[in-house]
Amino acid sequence: MNVAEITAKAEVLLEALPYVQDFRGSIFVVKYGGSFMDDPDPAGRTRVARDLAFLAAVGINVVVVHGGGKAITRAMESSGLKANFVNGMRQTDEATIAVVKKTLDEVVNRDVCDAIGGAGGKPKGMPGDSVLVCQKLTTDDNGNPVDLGYVGDVTEVKVKLIKKEIADGFIPVISPVAEGYDGKPYNVNADLVAGRVASALRARRLVYMSDVPGLLANPADPESLISTVKVGQIDDLKKKGIIDKGMRPKVQSAMRALQEGVQRVHFIDGRLAHSLLLEIFTDKGIGTEFVQ
């Protein structure tokens, strides 16, 4: 390595310094999802885990909410159950919720925790229904009546339990399952869970990691990334089709989180090496940030 390369590395560290100083002690909620979670090559998951461990090492209080839809589908197939979807939402009967909870808590959550632990972090797996309360979902996104079975909408986050783990030096890793008013587990949308958790914890940042670079003005052109979106622009972007159906739950959650005190929400590509660090600790960033 020559002097120029060494100096360039030092410049990267110096660019990160003011962000590290500013964010120390802040809460960041990271929604960990996307196809890279299912990639047979563990390199992508390892990179993300190292980024999460790095955030914790520099004094940022990280809370992780993970998805796991593909793992659930595989587990259902192995159990002889058929996955049915209504407007993108999984119908969940008693047999299905048992598979959902077992897969999320005992397989996906454990895998995420193992990856973070392997990177030097201190993860603490938290079954979602130990910290999330929900009501049964009775309408779809358009307000039409719908019965999806054991599918809920989070109404309460048990902040004290999560903050206790943070105070004890852990990275809470929460699965998207909530306890219903009837005491039974319910399947809940992980994107919406991340937003509710961020709002309840008064998080400084909410970061969504998925399979796209962020919000694209032209979905066919990865170079058309929109770096910053203000809440007031969102309706227009929906009308133009820039915010499509697949992105709407994330954007809806981002809007609500911003309205409830989260300072910024970021959409980044989890497949890109160290995208989390590049978004948080560089001046330009690498994804799309949503602001008030």
From Swiss-Prot:
Q: Does the keyword Transferase apply?
A: yes
What EC number(s) does the entry state? 2.7.2.8
What family is this? Belongs to the acetylglutamate kinase family. ArgB subfamily.
Compartments reported by the entry: Cytoplasm
Top-level division of the source organism's lineage: Bacteria
Keyword vocabulary terms for this entry: Amino-acid biosynthesis, Arginine biosynthesis, ATP-binding, Cytoplasm, Kinase, Nucleotide-binding, Transferase
* Catalytic activity from the UniProt record: N-acetyl-L-glutamate + ATP = N-acetyl-L-glutamyl 5-phosphate + ADP
Query: Which residues are substrate-binding?
Result: 68-69, 90, 187
InterPro entries, per database record: AceGlu_kinase-like_sf, AcgluKinase_fam, ArgB, Asp/Glu/Uridylate_kinase, Glu/AcGlu_kinase, NAGK-C
Q: What does this protein do?
A: Catalyzes the ATP-dependent phosphorylation of N-acetyl-L-glutamate.
Organism source for this protein?
Opitutus terrae (strain DSM 11246 / JCM 15787 / PB90-1)
GO annotations of cellular component type: cytoplasm
| PANTHER family (UniProt xref) | N-ACETYLGLUTAMATE SYNTHASE, N-ACETYLGLUTAMATE SYNTHASE, MITOCHONDRIAL
Q: What is this protein called?
A: Acetylglutamate kinase
According to its UniProt entry, one GO biological process term is:
L-arginine biosynthetic process
Q: Where is this site: Transition state stabilizer?
A: 31, 250
**Listed GO MF terms:** acetylglutamate kinase activity; ATP binding
Group of enzyme by EC:
transferase
Q: Which HAMAP family does UniProt cross-reference here? A: ArgB
**Pfam families to which the protein is assigned, alphabetical:** AA_kinase (PF00696)
Pathway entry: Amino-acid biosynthesis; L-arginine biosynthesis; N(2)-acetyl-L-ornithine from L-glutamate: step 2/4
